[in-house]
Curated annotation (Swiss-Prot):
Monomer and homodimer. Part of the essential Sec protein translocation apparatus which comprises SecA, SecYEG and auxiliary proteins SecDF-YajC and YidC. It is found in: Cell inner membrane; Cytoplasm. PROSITE patterns: SECA, SECA_MOTOR_DEAD. May bind 1 zinc ion per subunit. The lineage of its organism: Bacteria, Pseudomonadati, Campylobacterota, Epsilonproteobacteria, Campylobacterales. The gene is secA. SMART domains: SecA_DEAD (SM00957), SecA_PP_bind (SM00958). It comes from Helicobacter pylori (strain HPAG1). This is Protein translocase subunit SecA. It catalyses: ATP + H2O + cellular proteinSide 1 = ADP + phosphate + cellular proteinSide 2. Its EC number is 7.4.2.8. It holds the Pfam family SEC-C.
Length: 865
């Protein structure tokens, strides 16, 4: 109340921003007569001068220069638009362009020309010479907007590209991203970023920078889709026959002759005879060539499966599946699988079907993808209700832009009925009345199910209508455009048709414009406002009204008792409704509660993803270093060798490594043979002093002797790609482990432990293990690589080229779907303060806390049924 009074006296923060922007508008308008007099060539030359000025400025000062040239850039862009598009930017659109350039969100009502507004900020920021991304919610809008604005951009000397799901060719994508301005969907931009970080050449990466992005329908992308990460997943190993072949080879090998078993350390060491036998059975000349790395790995796992793991002790076979027996509890660990191909090796051993595991190869949330941009801005018709979240999560201020013409739409109070049947009966009557009159009506529903229900009722009444939901998404734009025709009745889910204007004829305006009927309040006020905003564009007349019932989800869970009591006191009969500002306010308060719950939920999930994001950035940075031909990969390998040896010697019992027992020396000899392919005689180890130096020099000389057949360029290339392969495999395994950790961490909340703290702690330890695994695995792999002659090195290069090509084009699945993180949120609620007795139960059953979890504790599966 006090805040509102102060706002009226001195103006709100938004008012002060608009006042500042209006001063700039006067400056831009003053330049209009000058540019109007110029020929097309003169106008283009003037814009080229701005490009030269900005690009000649030092990079860290370019933003300052952009602000200096903003009036000229906006004025030239407006003049060019008048000539090319026959559209002149209004003053309020100039304000919108400045808001976007400042890295804020421009809240502009439907029909205010957001597509044209974007051209001002895009043209200005593209002066720097870095690609500007314009992000939309679907392929149709990306294609439409880019094609409509392309002539303007071409006039200004810019190239334009559009990324859609239909662009499959990598070279074509690379070409599109080389353009000055790139339109595309949020999904395509996000997936391309992930794909870039799976490439084996810097030249193949399509996104060269993340300088500036304008996100259209920013609330939909950064709020509604914030909880659904982009995931690229794929099979762990596509060649399932390798497991069966390796199992055959392992079963044919003899203990002591072909391999030895170290039961104490649960390891197996293949002898020279065993290697020869395996090479013969696999049909290869050298098991440890790069191209045979997968076979040697499968053989290692098959030997472990056959000689170290035993049925009814380590695992059982049930229902054609291998089920792990927990070594500590003796219980079955259903759903768990051994990693690194061991589980598949056991399946091959037992003759059951081998499961091709699908695991996460790369993932990112939109929150973390878009926060990478140096400057980010957005546009939408509805952002103020989520202003706090935009600021806290993305550091984006929301600025409400005044409309060019006053809004004439009438927003009527909600009508509330006792039952859903009564509500729908009233809706059908209203639709029939409007249809008979010829006034177009757009009916918003909360789900496909409800739209189908309404469709059946209208069909029964023989009222012609069109249904728009996920089943007809390909016709979305066409259906929405026709929603303003005389007598049109359109049923749509609340989010349908965003970005498509419903234009009205003068006849329709005389009839009262587009009539909006909402059949249910959404959990978010913003979605309701979007539905209302379909009507009343650019000063058009229109009406909106919501029809509710006590059986609606929102009213059933929040506050329906009070409203129900009012209805009973009034003695309302079937079919009658109540209409009151107090009731409407009660519904909006219920929505605020739900919005706050969702905000806290998204904030918690982001805190979890931030942990993984820091790890992701670190890995991707190192990956880019490896891709750089100037990176000293040999020094990295030497560093890893030193680390691996330190780990080995640190595990030896004797403090003085010069006085190792014969058993320890024998163990060291076996480790050097098994892990590093180093043949060292026992007497040489006994005589060595200091032993660490002897072993280090032995491994180094063995490696350098192997690499002599390669020239420096070949060596660097092979080392970099092999290291990338090791890094990628380890990263995939790490993501798999992190997924498992996240799945189980939610239960800690019921033990009064903060799941987030536990997750941070354990994920950090896992990341340290991941780094250690890379170092150890790298040196093991490089130690086992063999090049006997130049032909071997050429074969290796060809293999690596094919491997890189296959990896970049491997069969993967792209997912952008709801995650199972609801459990996480419920756990957080369990950890946080207990709700009051009469508050809604946090398990979302719709009951009060005292009648639900307060009595019985959280329901099985965390959700009440």
């Amino acid at each position: 109340m006090i805040k509102a009074i102060i706002g009226k006296i001195i103006g709100t923060r938004n008012d002060r921003w608009i006042k500042q922007y209006k001063k700039q508008v006067l400056t831009i308008n003053a330049l209009e007569p000058t540019y109007e007099k110029m020929s097309d060539v003169e106008l283009q030359n003037a814009f080229e001068e701005l490009k030269k000025r900005v690009r000649s400025t030092e990079k860290n000062l370019q933003e300052k220069t952009l602000l200096e040239v903003l009036p000229e850039s906006f004025a030239i862009t407006r003049e060019a638009s008048k000539r090319i598009l026959k559209m002149r930017h209004f003053d309020v659109q100039l304000i919108g362009g400045m808001v976007l350039n400042d890295g804020k969100i421009a809240e502009m009502k439907t029909g205010e020309g957001k597509t044209l507004v974007a051209t001002l900020a895009v043209a200005l920021n593209a002066l720097k010479g870095e690609s500007v991304y314009v992000v939309t919610v679907n392929d149709y809008l990306a294609h439409r907007d880019s094609k409509e604005m392309e002539p303007l951009y071409h006039f200004l000397g810019y190239s334009v590209g559009t990324i859609t799901a239909s662009v499959r060719d990598d070279d074509e994508r690379l070409e599109i991203y080389s353009k000055d301005i790139v339109y595309g969907t949020n999904n395509e931009f996000g997936f391309d970023y992930l794909r870039d970080n799976m490439k084996y050449s810097l030249e193949h990466k399509v996104q060269k920078s993340h300088a500036f992005a304008i996100v259209d329908e920013v609330d939909s992308i950064l709020i509604d889709e914030a909880r659904t990460p982009l995931i690229i997943s794929g099979p762990v190993d596509r060649r399932m026959e390798n497991y069966n072949k390796a199992d055959e080879v392992a079963k044919s090998m003899q203990v002591e002759t072909d391999f030895t078993i170290d039961e104490k350390n649960r390891t197996i060491l293949i002898t020279e005879e065993g290697i020869k036998k395996a090479e013969n059975l696999f049909g290869v000349d050298n098991l440890y060539k790069i191209e045979n790395a997968a076979l040697s790995h499968h053989l290692d796992q098959a030997l472990k499966a056959n000689y170290l793991f035993f049925i009814d002790k380590d695992y059982i076979v049930a229902n054609n599946e291998v089920v792990i027996v927990d070594e500590f509890t003796g219980r079955l660990s259903e759903g768990r699988r051994f990693s690194e191909g061991l589980h598949q090796a056991l399946e091959a051993k037992e003759g059951v079907s081998i499961k091709e595991e699908s695991q996460t190869l790369a993932d990112i949330t939109f929150q973390n993808y878009f926060r990478m941009f140096s400057k980010l801005s957005g546009m939408t018709g509805t952002a103020q209700t989520e202003a706090t979240e935009f600021l806290e999560i993305y550091n984006l201020e929301v600025v409400s832009i005044p409309t060019n013409l006053a809004i004439k739409r009438k927003d009527l109070n909600d009508l509330i009925y006792k039952s859903e049947k009564e509500k729908f009966d009233a809706v059908i009557l209203k639709i029939k009345e409007l249809h008979d009159k010829g006034q177009p009506v757009l009916v918003g529903t909360a789900s496909i199910e409800k739209s189908e229900t309404l469709h059946a009722l209208l069909k029964k009444e023989r009222i012609p209508h069109t249904v728009l939901n996920a089943k007809q998404h390909t016709k979305e734009a066409e259906i929405i455009k026709d929603a303003g025709l005389k007598g049109a009745v359109t049923i749509a889910t609340n989010m349908a048709g965003r970005g498509v204007d419903i234009k009205l004829t003068d006849e329709i305006k005389e009839l009262g414009g587009l009539y909006i009927i909402g059949t249910e309040r959404h959990e978010s006020r913003r979605i309701d406002n979007q539905l209302r905003g379909r009507s009343g564009r650019q000063g058009d007349p229109g009406t909106s009204q919501f029809y509710l019932s006590l059986e609606d989800n929102l009213l059933r869970i929040f506050g329906s008792d009070r409203i129900k009591g009012v209805m009973e006191k009034l003695g309302l009969k079937d079919g009658e409704h109540i209409e009151s500002k107090l009731v409407t306010r009660a519904v909006e308060n219920a929505q605020k509660k739900v919005e706050n719950l969702h905000f806290e939920s998204r904030k918690h999930l982001l805190e979890y993803d931030d942990v993984a994001n820091e790890q992701r950035k670190s890995v991707y940075k190192f990956r880019d270093e490896l891709l750089d031909i100037n990176y000293d990969i040999s020094a990295k390998i030497a560093e890893n060798r030193e680390y691996a040896l330190n780990q080995i010697f640190s595990k030896l019992k004797a403090f003085d490594h010069q006085n190792l027992s014969e058993e320890e020396l024998l163990g060291l000899k076996n480790v050097l043979k098994e892990d590093f392919n180093a043949h060292v005689e026992l007497e040489d180890l006994e005589k060595a002093s200091p032993i660490e130096k002897f072993v280090a020099e032995k491994l180094k000389s063995d490696y350098e002797n192997k690499m002599k057949v390669l020239d420096s360029e070949q060596r660097s290339r092979i080392e970099r790609i092999v290291y990338l392969q090791i890094l990628d495999n380890a990263w995939r395994e790490h993501l798999y482990t992190m997924d498992n950790l996240k799945t189980g961490i939610n239960l800690r909340g019921y033990n009064q432990k903060d799941p987030l703290v536990e997750y941070k702690k354990e994920s950090y330890n896992l990341f340290l293990e991941f780094i250690e695994d890379i170092k150890i695995e790298a040196i093991k792999t490089f130690s086992k690589i063999q090049f006997e002659n130049e032909q071997d090195s050429s074969d290796a290069e060809r293999y690596l080229d094919n491997f890189s090509e296959e990896r970049e084009h491997e069969s993967v699945t792209y997912r952008h779907e709801e995650t199972l993180d609801e459990d996480l949120n419920v756990a957080m609620k369990a950890f946080s303060k207990t709700p009051k007795r009469n508050e809604p139960c946090p398990c979302q059953s719709g009951k009060k806390y005292k009648d639900c979890c307060a009595k019985s504790g959280p329901k099985k599966g965390l959700f009440a049924k």
